[in-house]
Amino acid sequence: MFASTTPSEFNRALMAKVEVRKQQGLWSDAVAELGRVRTFALSEDELEGYYYQRALCSYLAADFEGALAAIDEARFALYDTVALARMELIEALAAGEKGDWERSQMAARRVVAAMPAEQQAEMEQRLNEIYSKAPRMRSPELAWWLSMVPGLGQLYAGEVWSGVVSLVANGALVTFGVGEIVAHHWLSAWLGAGGLLSTTYFVGQERARILTERRNQRVLREHNDLLRAELLK
């Protein structure tokens, strides 16, 4: 590659290296190599292959934002609608991984439109059912703020048992602290109940945020597993 005397020769050597990285399953490395391609020296056909490989390798490297960016660039750079159609499947899957259901469904519809006519109605019906059940992402930040009321953030995250435990634990500490104050045991109220309450309270807030993030990841993964299985049949 270092002996290449023209941009075209450099690109051919680089694309050969990309193929090696793909065969090795090193998708991130393949994306990095594609980033070195001198696109100004590519023909229309080569440019089509370049964007397709960038989108595909980015998706397989779990760089879904990168896959969608490659497809967006291809729409400006390519005039061949057939070439763009090759990327519709990647767009539907990558947008789904980002939780962009509207973009994902639009791309999936274009995938279905390219299928044989006798398959379209059934496939569209199954996809509509999947997209109708697309999960809504919950806000980790909102979960943190809701946890100012002990247990409420965990309930928002869908962790009922964790929320009940947090509510009971913090309630017990408050009850103990009030009892110690009434009994004029100021030191034990401050060091015991107060110290433990501050620990469980703030830990509970952070835990609610983490639980919400995990919930989002889980429902997103489950839904995209269904979508991928349907589109790759």
Segments predicted by a language model, with ranges:
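Alpha-helical protein-protein interaction scaffolds
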Residues: 1-132
